[in-house]
Amino acid sequence: MSEQPFWQQKTLDDMSDAEWESLCDGCGQCCLHKLMDEDTDEIYFTNVACRQLNIKTCQCRNYARRFEYEPDCIKLTRENLPTFEWLPPTCAYRLLAEGKPLPAWHPLLTGSKAAMHGERISVRHIAVPESTVVDWQDHILNLPDRAR
């Protein structure tokens, strides 16, 4: 009889730092810049990638030192997770916090990121480099509700 994976055995609070980090599927959606409406506080996703995001791999170029390079970079923690209502519906942190299973394409289930990229969950199909953007409002998009 096989043992259940850690994300089915533990709460988010009980996970080790390594387990917590491994939940990230590496889609890069957190690394897309967001715009906030000053009147309504509504958050809009853009397809504008952070300067540190390698769009092809959807990985941070300087993950260990990302806050030095990008002071506005998001640090998702167990404590602040509830404040990130904008996390995509496919986000493992959000799904597990809501008592939902990981989607079938998640790298922890498939062993690679290929299925995630194939399902077009990652941003590598839509992201543009920040250095090429003139008018950020032209890059507002609606991300699909793709949790599976």
UniProtKB/Swiss-Prot annotation:
User: Superkingdom, according to UniProt?
Assistant: Bacteria
InterPro entries in UniProt: Puta_zinc/iron-chelating_dom, UCP006173
Which Pfam family, any one, appears in the UniProt record?
CxxCxxCC
Give the transmembrane ranges. Answer: none
Concerning its family, UniProt says:
Belongs to the UPF0260 family.
- What HAMAP family does the entry give? UPF0260 (MF_00676)
This protein's name? UPF0260 protein KPN78578_22800
* Classification of source organism: Bacteria, Pseudomonadati, Pseudomonadota, Gammaproteobacteria, Enterobacterales
